[in-house]
Amino acid sequence: MELSYQALRVASQNREAEELRTEARRKNLLILIMHYLLQEGYVDSANSLEQETKISSRRFEVCDNVDLETILMEYESYYYIKFQKYPKITKKALDHDSRVQPKPRSAGKLRRAGSNSTQGLPRIGQQQVIHRPVSSSYYRTNGHQKALSRENSKQESGGNSPQEASEVGLNVSAISKASGEGSHTRRRQVIDFRSMIQDTIKGASQEIALNSLNCNPDPSERLIKPVGAFIGGNSEMRELAAVISRDIYLQNPNVRWDDIIGLDAAKRLVKEAVVYPIRYPQLFTGILSPWKGLLLYGPPGTGKTLLAKAVATECNTTFFNISASTIVSKWRGDSEKLVRVLFELARYHAPSTIFLDELESVMSQRGTGPGELDYAMLRRLEKRILVDLPSKEARQAMIQHWLPPISNSSGVELRMDLDYSTLGEETDGYSGSDIRLVCKEAAMRPVRKIFDALENHHSEHKKLPVISLETVTTSDFSEVLAHTKPSAKSLAEKYSAWQNEFESV
């Protein structure tokens, strides 16, 4: 099958829009149930539902003229119009001992059930003829006329009689051809399928563009599956799952890929492993299946955790931010159970991303680098990415980002007169966090000079002069560099040597 860029992009947008619609539908249903419980006085049940779903009733409210009881009444009316009978919503349960407990449906079953349930619904925009229920005497008196009309329709349509309209609730009418068109079938007619596909793609993209205005993929707004439906009725596993669920990242770190200066190779590989397989699954099949594990290693302060925050911000996946204290227990056997529950919980909340900070701390030997990792674990980390110290261009961009020529923060104007190219060369060996610390210290130097005037002012009637900060120069920055040494310069050679032996990019 031939793939095009437009088709891949539209398919990805269609998938994202459908996932957002499904998520919004589930959330709206829970909010309607919570509103109904509060309206009917079931306060304890509503509080339990709010605690389990993490949906606060104070953050959302039901719109006007929308109510769960009203929706049920509308469904009953629609069902009666279509089938001439009211729907049967509930039924009497079996014996209490032999009654089967309902199992929670998975997301795939929910999607299939939703797609099957909407096949018989009329499309929006088409003319609909609603048939009112007719008494049985009408059919007895008019049976002969219906038989004659069916015979006439058979003769007009060439023997192909449509299904009776009253049986399916649809109005079927014949289409008469214009006098200028030929009645014979054109066997060699050419149909332009390419233009039809392009028109369909164009219409779908426009619909997605309109619907995407209301989409808010904020992690704090994401609906998390209930832990009570995890691993059946095993209470021990559910307790361990509750411990792991506390580390699901629900906040928005607000870190974009463009906010990370440098690290182009690391960002590209992380996108290939996490972002693109979800966005374009047609390209990641067979031998091109995405990588299951990534190892980000390098000196401290170079942006490894920042890459993880960008994944949590940009990707619409369940993000597990796991630390060593979460999966390490003093009780024998509990650590193994926690690791097992972690991966089973990740499958339960799929698609998921697990971020393990300081992975070497949970291995057999505690160390400070990737050399302490177990070889079996190293084999499962298919991509091993070195997050190295920033280059000269990256250091120069970082200094210009933190110390722009004019900074007006909280009404205090701070000016810079810096030679960014020279400072980029002088900061060789500094990590990203070191450069931020140096920039902060350089900006603090002119602020310290006004503290004496503020503290030594004792006269209440005499006004203080307007605060005016001195300009930060290149010499000020160089003096700060002389007193602030890099924290990880000695580790760069160690990581480079390990990269030469175990590199996999």
From Swiss-Prot:
Biased composition (Polar residues): 114-127, 155-164
Annotated SMART domains: AAA, LisH
Alphabetical list of Gene3D superfamilies matching this protein: 1.10.8.60, P-loop containing nucleotide triphosphate hydrolases (3.40.50.300)
EC numbers, comma separated: 5.6.1.1
Keywords carried by this UniProt record: ATP-binding, Cytoplasm, Cytoskeleton, Isomerase, Microtubule, Nucleotide-binding
Positions of the UniProt region annotated as Disordered: 94-127, 140-167
Keyword Magnesium: no
Binding-site list for ATP: 298-305
One GO CC term on file: cytoplasm
InterPro entries linked to this entry: AAA+_ATPase, AAA_lid_3, ATPase_AAA_core, Katanin_p60_AL2, LisH, MT-severing_AAA_ATPase, P-loop_NTPase
Catalytic activity: n ATP + n H2O + a microtubule = n ADP + n phosphate + (n+1) alpha/beta tubulin heterodimers
Main location: cytoplasm
One Gene Ontology term of the molecular function aspect: ATP hydrolysis activity
Subcellular location, record wording: Cytoplasm, Cytoskeleton; Cytoplasm; Cytoplasm, Cytoskeleton, Spindle; Cytoplasm, Cytoskeleton, Spindle pole
All copies of domain LisH, residue ranges: 25-57
GO biological process: microtubule severing
PANTHER family: AAA DOMAIN-CONTAINING, KATANIN P60 ATPASE-CONTAINING SUBUNIT A-LIKE 2
Function: Severs microtubules in vitro in an ATP-dependent manner. This activity may promote rapid reorganization of cellular microtubule arrays.
Family: Belongs to the AAA ATPase family. Katanin p60 subunit A1 subfamily. A-like 2 sub-subfamily.
Protein name: Katanin p60 ATPase-containing subunit A-like 2
Organism: Xenopus laevis
Gene: katnal2
